């Protein structure tokens, strides 16, 4: 009996030790890995996420968060450090890219308009010594071309748990709105980014990618734009975007309407896209209305 009791006590002590070790390890390393490539590894600290502002919607008992803050971390390979130093224009401060190991930043996120702002950022060497730091940065809207999009999605998911990160990484993130081929063999394909879709009153707002190829299959035009489609009225407007053409590279997009709404003509490929957007908004109402406060 004494041996059984002693064995049980030892097992209990061992289990307590293992549990305590796990807790200590978690406390020492608050970072959760998000992704890595040959230049960067991205992490965020879930325990650091907090709501700093919220609003109460009519006929709802719980407030909706409108501003979040959190800490993020980026570690660098030599190539990533070199690129970062160049982008920040700090070669006079960090002369050797090999010394830049990682950066920690505090960011503020605005879920309703997919905005992320750096409040502060500090660069470190491998030993944890500060190499350089900066204060508040500009606001950046998150889309498929944004370096910080994974940070944004992970932070928002901590509060809302709507699957922002999963949708961003999904194979069907982009859906075809419409495609068309002219008699000359020129093909146009327009796709919409479901991860950016949100409803604001009658408008469905999202980022779209338009690609035009000639009869030989060469890409002759690309448009990447944020647009608002008024679903009941069947109108749309370009909010912002960029345009690419061979020899010209990427430029700011000028749609010729100066941001005004235009009617989507009937019996056109664009109307097929409108019908698909209406169906999507009806079928995925929870998704397009997430975080909504209007």
Regions found by a protein language model. Name each.
Residues 24-225, 229-294:
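N-terminal secretory-pathway/extracellular module detecting exported/lumenal segments
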Residues 10-14, 276:
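N-terminal leader/targeting signatures
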Residues 1-10:
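Bacterial N-terminal signal peptides that target proteins for export
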Residues 14-23:
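C-terminal segment of classical bacterial N-terminal signal peptides
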